[in-house]
Amino acid sequence: MRARLLDAAISCLIDKGYSGTSTQEISRRAGVSRGAQLHHFPTKESLVVAAVEHLVEQRLAELLEAHAAGQDASVEVFLDAFSGPLFYAALELWIAARTDPALHAAVLPLEARVNEAINTGGAVIFGDRMTPEAIEISVELARGLAVSALFRNDKSDQELRKRLVPIWEAMVTTR
């Protein structure tokens, strides 16, 4: 039931944005009663924050599995991690948290956990090829590119990536 609520919350964030997401709609999409939803998540903030954290954990696990399977890592890992509908669900949360004190308070600890997970995962994936600062720069650059991609079409986005990735890779990796 918890997983259904988390998935429904992400679906709502993607489809309706944070302001259009309601706990009633999440419960409806999850196929659970409002009481069951409240038992697991007493507030909208707690539910959407848990949903985004769940997404981050899933995505990091996928990246670590790919690394364990021998897939070579490049800075494209950051672009892939911070793009698409799932990233935009998290972005909805950040934007709403800017002006919503309760959500802001809920998102701050999440951001700390996400940053720790990214740093830990980046160290595993890149080893000595990237310093912690290079990982941080890469995260910030990938997030910025993902936001600006909202205003580019797929073709221009791919062209931009093709031009920037080799330069970015050379700047942040040690070999």
Q: What is each of the regions a protein language model found here?
A:
Residues 1, 5-8, 86, 134:
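N-terminal positioning helix adjacent to the helix-turn-helix/winged-helix DNA-binding module
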Residues 44, 51, 55-59, 86, ...:
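Hydrophobic/aromatic residues within well-ordered alpha-helical segments
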Residues 81-105, 111:
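Amphipathic alpha-helical segments used for helix-helix packing
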Residues 46, 50, 60-88, 134-138, ...:
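Hydrophobic alpha-helical connector segments
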Residues 104-108, 124-175:
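Hydrophobic/aromatic-rich alpha-helical bundle segments in the mid-to-C-terminal region
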Residues 4, 8-46, 50:
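Helix-turn-helix
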Residues 8-15, 62, 89, 93, ...:
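Solvent-exposed, amphipathic alpha-helical segments
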Residues 42-46, 50, 98, 102, ...:
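Residues in soluble alpha-helical coiled-coils and helical-bundle/repeat scaffolds
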